[in-house]
C-alpha cells in the first residue's frame, strides 16, 4: 500500500492523492482500487499524538502501526525539512520500506532518506505544490493506463 504524509497544503495533497489512488484519477477509467492512505487525515490521531508525544511524531506513530515491508511511504514537503516527515522517512528506511519524496528546493534533509526524489528546484511554495500535483497525476495516469490494458 501507499502511505502519504505532509503538512498544511502538502497534507491536503497527501489526502487528495491517496483518494485518487484508492478510487481513481479519471472518471471513465474503471480499474481495481489501489491501496492508499494519508497519514495526515485523522484529526483525532494527529492531535492525540501531537499532545501526548510531540508534533514531530504525528506520522511516525501511525506509520509504525500500519506499515508493512512491501509498502511505500510518500513524503511531501515543499522545504524538504519538515521534521515529522523526516522522522517517518528515517524510520521507514531503517525498516527497509521504500520511500519516495516529493520535495522542494534542493530537497532539504529529507532527500537523504528517499529512494526516489521528485524535487522541484524552487523556493516558491505555490509553484512547488503545483508541480508536485502535476507529477503525481502524471504518475497515476501512467499507472492507470497500464492497469486497464
Task: Walk through the language-model features, giving the residues of each.
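Glycine-rich, small/polar surface segments that engage phosphate groups of diverse ligands
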Residues: 1-67
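A short, small-residue-rich loop immediately preceding and capping a beta-strand
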Residues: 1-5, 69-80
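Short glycine/serine/threonine-rich phosphate/pyrophosphate-binding segments
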Residues: 10-15, 81-88
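Short beta->alpha connector loops at strand-helix junctions that form conserved
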Residues: 40, 77, 103, 118-126
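A charged, well-structured terminal subsegment
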Residues: 65, 126-149
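Glycine-centered short loops/turns at secondary-structure junctions
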Residues: 70, 96-97
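Short, well-ordered beta-strand core segments
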Residues: 73, 99, 117-118
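Short, glycine/polar-rich helix-capping loops at beta-to-alpha or helix-loop-helix junctions
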Residues: 102-114
